[in-house]
Amino acid sequence: SYGYRKIIKKNIIKNLKRPIINLHISYLPHNRGADPNFWSFKNKTPKGVTIHEIDSGIDTGDILFRKKIKFLIKKDTSFKHTYFILRNEIEKLFKKNCTKIISGKYSKIKQIYKKKLKLKKNLPKKLNWDTPIKKFII
């Protein structure tokens, strides 16, 4: 799953022979839920991408692979710019580990999450893709 905004029902997950995986553009367990790119800057948490198993929670499944990403934020760097970098990085992480995912040859990292889930409705109203990060956050 990537960009899928629906919650998969517990009975469907339970009855599958293999786990469902999700490609998430945050460095889990930080910034679970919607719009993790924004929240990573707002809350000054690590930025990155994660491939994890889907469980009955929202972005709470075991971590399979993840990568931290460092951004050089200039005056005009927008959320759109950083989103496309994250999207590119999650694709590269998936391609690099696709064979391991298919074969099931990977180690799992249990998530320990203490932070609150981020919801789309919590986003500031004035935020848009072209908003410069420095203007809005820093």
Regions found by a protein language model. Name each.
Residues Y2-K134:
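Donor/substrate-binding cores of folate-linked one-carbon enzymes
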